[in-house]
């Protein structure tokens, strides 16, 4: 699995958004400039999130720890 510096997944509106490098959830945005393709349910390398996870609000995790 690629490290977060290569590819990270950020939760937003129940979607999963792949970002090429850089920080994702820290800034409260799904993706940095560039790739904005969203697919699948909300999840990322750090945690498994419940439905309704958004970076702008609280992120309820069912496993692990979100930085959102």
UniProtKB/Swiss-Prot annotation:
The UniProt entry, under Pfam families, shows: Metallothio_6
Question: Which UniProt keywords are given for this protein, alphabetically ordered?
Answer: Metal-binding, Metal-thiolate cluster
- Sequence intervals crossing the membrane: none
Q: What InterPro entries is this protein classified in?
A: Metalthion_4_echinoid/annelid, Metalthion_4_echinoidea, Metalthion_dom_sf
State if Nucleotide-binding is listed as a keyword: no
Give GO MF terms, alphabetically: metal ion binding
* Keyword Disulfide bond set for record: no
Return the similarity comment. Belongs to the metallothionein superfamily. Type 4 family.
What does it do? Metallothioneins have a high content of cysteine residues that bind various heavy metals.
Instruction: Quote the protein name from its UniProt record.
Output: Metallothionein
- Which species does the entry assign this protein to? Lytechinus pictus
